[in-house]
Amino acid sequence: MKLLILCVMVHGLLAEGPGQVLWKEQVVAPEFLLDDREDIASNRNAFFYEDKRSFRPEGLGEQVKRIAGAEDVGLQPRLVTRSLQCTCETEYEYRNLGEGHYPRYLTTSHCKPKACQNKFNSCRLLYYKVHILSQRDLNGLSDDRYSDDSETETPLPEALRHKWQLKPMKIPVACVPATG
């Protein structure tokens, strides 16, 4: 069935005159090629997205069509956009561990939510273990959400051991597909 629909779409794109087309002419393309911009007005990264929205590859012009009778054919017009792969995007932020920690600032990440993510196409955080030096009289690091107190303390040289301790932490570093 999918092959038949694909053949009908290709036939419509290759048709020379309006009499050869099996459906009404409308633009069909991924959402970033269409010219409706009301859905990106609230997007804080609209200026990045704007370039994609106004991009129209050479040769698409009037040749690109949308199936107007989607109910008749059993094909949803937005199915074209669903075929684009949904990738995981990572947003980074600096985390201040406070005075008495070295390094004081770490870069952590979280997954940027996207409309195409669902239970079949979801993302998860990838964690790396890092070791942080913290002063012994400060115990704020043990309350940290990234702290990994399940492991024993890593030994330090004698000169540092009385004032500092080396604590392992699991830091989120990237957003990756959950199935993989």
Curated annotation (Swiss-Prot):
GO cellular component, one term: extracellular region
UniProt keyword Disulfide bond present: yes
GO biological process: neuropeptide signaling pathway
Disulfide bridge partners, by residue number: 88-123, 111-175
Keywords, in A-Z order: Cleavage on pair of basic residues, Disulfide bond, Hormone, Neuropeptide, Secreted, Signal
Entry's localization field: Secreted
InterPro entries, alphabetized: Cystine-knot_cytokine (IPR029034), Insect_Hormone_Regulators (IPR052876)
Signal peptide (UniProt feature, chain positions): 1-15
A GO term for molecular function: prothoracicotrophic hormone activity
Highest taxon of the lineage: Eukaryota
SUPFAM superfamilies: Cystine-knot cytokines (SSF57501)
Residue ranges annotated as propeptide in the record: 16-64
Alphabetical list of PANTHER family matching this protein: PROTHORACICOTROPIC HORMONE, ISOFORM F (PTHR39940:SF1)
Subunit structure: Homodimer; disulfide-linked.
Role played: PTTH is a brain secretory polypeptide of insects which stimulates the prothoracic glands to produce and release ecdysone, the steroid essential to insect development.
Name assigned to this protein: Prothoracicotropic hormone
